[in-house]
Amino acid sequence: MAKVLFVVPYAKYYLNFNRDLLESLVRDGHSVTALAPDTIVEDTLAAIGVKFVRVPIRNTGLNPLYDLRSILHLVRIIGDEDPDIISCYSIKPVLYGSLAARLANKGRVFVNITGLGYMFMERTWKQRMLMPIVKTLYRQAFRHCEGAFFENEDDLQLFTNIHFIQREKATIVNGVGVNLTSFRKPSGRTGKAPVTFILIARIIKAKGIYEYIEAARILKKKYPDIGIKLLGPFDVNPTAIREDQMTEWINEQVVDYLGETRDVRPHLNSSDVFVLPSYYREGTPKSILEAMSMGMPVITTNTPGCKETVIPEYNGFLVPVKNAAALAEAMERFILDPGLIERMGACSREIAEQKYDVHKVNSRIRSVMQI
């Protein structure tokens, strides 16, 4: 049996995204340890048989002294744990975890590119300044890893084009997958007016929140009874939306903000159409996969990570980024023809079963990692 160590940016989000993988490894007798900066789900991890070790990693910003401390801390922990396999997720855990593994001379290293995020979006002066450093660190990380997992072809193509990684080391997986049993189509959804839309995401600009609000304004002038829901936590991302801005939207009665939840299923169950107008460099948004598994049509953008989940006119619609008018037009299709909700929703479930079953995704990952 193998000793597997995961280095992740937030244990809370990692558990939500990858619980099935962790449970399958523990169930098969492997020793599993998770390293992360947040301790909020330590007890939950322990309950499923996963050891937790806190490691000081700041997932945003660049502080050379603090980051050096993080790397040295990782070197010590990896040396103490002596894992057979080290699997790193997201930017800093990939960069620092792989370097620490090399310095500790322990384990086979796999990196997981779950989207490119903030650094590969719009280029601010700060991003332009940091990018050469990030590229150098990425090249070092990939040079010494045994394999890399990507969630869409665009990200893989970018990383091979700029010579971060050799194609033969890379594997494309269909996101983190979705548990088709836990997220299944409920009974009782009628698809009748008024139609209710829901967006589930971190409350950051790059998830298309502003476009969603503007589309809601456009539609509510014609259809005041439609439901416009928004669910998700506030964030510290550089494009985070402030709570006072949300209060303004709530007072305007343009959106029903539902806050944060541990279980999105009741909210999906009470909604008709899932919307994610993101221009964040996604991997494959799990929120979309969960909605698809529950038999919901999807409106999202023609961007890497999002566009792969929708076959236009089959299980939903793709719209241009930062285009509230086009988004409103796509949303209106379901208002004018509510029958699309049931038909396209059934197609979403079909795609989820064929392509995004979490057990198939995890089997692929474990096969590559040989565990």
Predicted regions and their residues:
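Short hydrophobic beta-strand element within catalytic cores of glycosyltransferases
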Residues: 297-300, 310
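Acidic donor-binding loop of glycosyltransferase active sites
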Residues: 269-283, 296
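A short, well-ordered alpha-helix in the C-terminal region of glycosyltransferases
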Residues: 326, 333, 340-355, 361-367
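Nucleotide-activated donor-binding/catalytic signature segment of Leloir-type glycosyltransferases, i.e.
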Residues: 232, 241-260
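Donor nucleotide-sugar binding/catalytic pocket of nucleotide-sugar-dependent glycosyltransferases
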Residues: 53, 135-185
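A conserved mid-protein helix/loop that constitutes part of the nucleotide-sugar donor-binding site
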Residues: 15-20, 195, 199, 204-221, ...
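Conserved acidic donor-binding segment of nucleotide-sugar-dependent glycosyltransferases
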Residues: 311-313, 317-324, 333-339
